[in-house]
């Protein structure tokens, strides 16, 4: 038995999808433990691109897929993704936790109206209803998948919630109320499609652990978007750390292989402090070469140099023991590369990320500058064949964070991967 966990070390979009995809080849179960359809992951197989927002990345390898209790589910999006599997003749088993919460139309409406009302102070959400759904969960009025299995219970909860939500929509936001019958009838159709997938996933996972199955736990977004430890309030609405996987019913002590994914540069979507942001043409070049546009929103991502303070924080919080570096190939033909090693503000040097966003906005990055490499590295298979400049960049990261980078991604396709030890190449 082995239980692997994969998390992002930055603001999401690190390339977790590709790494998870090939790790899943010998995995029995892939478990998604947080987030909703605000998190997009892209996988390229045989030159065909797949983009999923809810289904785990490992679904393409035939592993059994579990959407855990802390995932919030938009039924329409999930049904559309199941259709993609069907249309591409991808066969797998999907299990939805009966404790997972359901995104309702009023959640999406609230997300849109709230962002509009904030104006220039908006968070930059995906407007998918994620935050309002988690808010209802914490407020103990959310609708769970188990409620969908009893039409009377679902209808009553919807009626109670919608009466309150429509009051707010009309009186606070001066907008049109949502129609109860329309929502009920639409969701009844969703229920017919999804009801056979809803089950006690905790029981399934306990049986898998006792049967010594291989399990891969997949996190959405990244450490710096964690609701507790990220750049609050410019964060997501769930816990993105490996510790949140306990919500699936898997004891943290069972997770021995903890893999952090680092993109060779930084990016973030939406508002919030971004110390290493590149505000010149180099940022534009990296964005276009790396196709750094949100797979969910299509919004252009903000681009920055690699920030080691975020990586060190992610390693400490997640207790990572393995690292994978992605998109190194995107950095070729750039004259100088930079890595942020500390912050400075009013003569004070920070070797950690301040808690206050107001402080983070004011700090200046302290950089280590590296000579760039010109070669196209996308077809290189062995580490020693990389340009010396690329190896110096990688080895500096390793020296600073104290963990070897075991996996290097030099292209979006599965085969464009360099393994630095036998353990990973045999998976």
UniProtKB/Swiss-Prot annotation:
GO terms for cellular component: cytoplasm. Coiled coil: none annotated. Its main location: cytoplasm. One of its GO terms (molecular function) is GTP binding. SUPFAM superfamilies: P-loop containing nucleoside triphosphate hydrolases. Pathway: Purine metabolism; AMP biosynthesis via de novo pathway; AMP from IMP: step 1/2. GO terms for biological process: 'de novo' AMP biosynthetic process; IMP metabolic process. Its EC number is 6.3.4.4. The keyword Zinc-finger does not apply. Transmembrane segments: none annotated. GTP binds at residues 12-18, 40-42, 301, 327-329, 409-411. The keyword Magnesium applies. Mg(2+) binds at residues 13, 40. Signal peptide: none annotated. Substrate binds at residues 295-301. It is an enzyme of class 6 (ligase). Keywords: Cytoplasm, GTP-binding, Ligase, Magnesium, Metal-binding, Nucleotide-binding, Purine biosynthesis. Belongs to the adenylosuccinate synthetase family. Homodimer. PANTHER family: ADENYLOSUCCINATE SYNTHETASE. This is Adenylosuccinate synthetase. The lineage of its organism: Bacteria, Pseudomonadati, Spirochaetota, Spirochaetia, Spirochaetales.
